[in-house]
C-alpha cells in the first residue's frame, strides 16, 4: 500500500478507501447512525463526494449499478408518496430521510467504485469495521476505560452501535472482506488481515449473535462458491483463522467475559488478563502470517497436497461444528422457547438455541398489515404505531424485525418490488469465477441481506452503509473492466 502511494500518488489509494471507512466509523460512533441529524449530515457528505468525483473523473457507470441507484431512488420517492395515506406522518417523514441517505450512499459508492475499482472500497469498509470492532472489544476487556459503557444488560457486546446483532453483522462483513483481501495479497496485506481477524472475530463472538454467525457461514459459502482458483483462495484466506479462533478460545478461561450479569470486579480483573494473552496471540499470528505459505508448505506442483489440506480442513471444521452444537436434537428442542435459555448465565449456550425470541408475534402482525394493504402498504414507518396500539403487547417493538416483511407491510408490493430490484440487480453482474475481492464483497453483502430478513439491522445505518458499499462494489465490478483494481492500477 505504501509503495503504491509513493509511486502513483495518495489520491488513487487513500481517497477511495477513506470514503467508506469514514462513513462507517462516523455513523457507527453516532449510536449506529439512528437519528435524523446523522442521516442529514451523511446525505450531505455522500452527495458532495459524488458531485466532486463526477466532475473530476466522469466515470462510466455500469447499467446494473444504474438500476441499483434507481431502485433506491424509487423507494425514497414511494416512501414520500406514502405520506398521503400514512397513519403516522411524522414517522413516514423520518423514513424518507433514511431512504435519501441510503440512495445517496449507494450513488456515492457506485461512483467511487466505478473510478477506482472494488478493492479500495472493500479495503475501506474492512478498515472501518475493524476500527469499530476493536473499540467494542476494548470496552469488554477494559470496562474501566474512559468512555467505556461498562457492563449492562446480559453482557452482550453492543457498543458503540447500541445493538449487539448489528455489531455482529458488522464484524461478519469485516471478516469476509478481510479474507478476500488476503487472497493473493502481498505479505503486508496478509499481515494486516490476520491482525484484523482478532478484533473482528472477538466482536462477532462477544455479541453472541446467532443471526450474524449464520450470515457469516452463508456469506463464506457464497464467496467460496464463486471465487476463482478456489483451493488457492481458501489457503490464502485461512491466514485469518488463527487470529479469529485463538482469542475466542482464550476467552473460555475467563467466565466473567462470557456470562450474563458478571461482577464488575471480576470483569476488570479477567479482562486485563485476557487482554495480555490476546495481544500475545496476535503477535504470534502476525509472525505466522508473514510466513504463511511456508508454514503450509505450498508450491506450484503441490496440487494434490493442497486438495487434501482443503478437504481435511473442511472435515475438521465439520466435526468441530457438530461437537460445538451439542447435537441436533438438543438444538431442535429449543424452537418452542419464547426466548433463548442458558443455564448458569453462560452466554455460549445462547448460540445453541433456535428460539425466535418473540419475533413470531411481530412477524404475524406485519403479515396481517400487509394483507390489509397489499399493493401500497400502510405507510412507511407505521409499524411501531401499529404494534403499540395494543397495550397487551409483552414488549415494545419499533420495527418488524425483517427488512422485506416490513417493506411489504408499510410500502406494499410496489415498495417490495423496488427493494428487491435494487438489491438483486448487482448480483447479476458477477462473472463466475469471480475475483477474490468481488467474491468477498458479494458474500459480505449477501450475508448481511440474509440477516436483515429476520432482524432490524437495516435500521442501524452504520452497518447498512458498510453493506451498501459492498453491494456497490459488486454492482460496479463490470464497469470499464474494473473487476478488481489493485492499488496503483490506472483508474478507469
Give names to the regions the model predicted:
Residues 163, 348-397, 404, 411-418:
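TM-adjacent membrane-interface loops and short helices in multi-pass inner/ER membrane proteins
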Residues 1-9, 479-492:
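Short, intrinsically disordered terminal tails adjacent to the first/last structured region
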Residues 155-158, 189, 360, 364, ...:
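Alpha-helical membrane and juxtamembrane elements of multi-pass inner-membrane transport
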Residues 64, 191, 356, 394, ...:
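A generic secondary-structure micro-motif detector
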Residues 135-146, 322-372, 376:
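Aromatic-rich transmembrane-lumenal/periplasmic boundary elements in polytopic membrane proteins
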Residues 60-65, 92-93, 114-121:
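Interfacial helix-loop-helix linkers and transmembrane-helix boundary segments
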Residues 2-32, 40-53, 72-83, 94-111, ...:
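Alpha-helical transmembrane segments of multi-pass inner-membrane proteins
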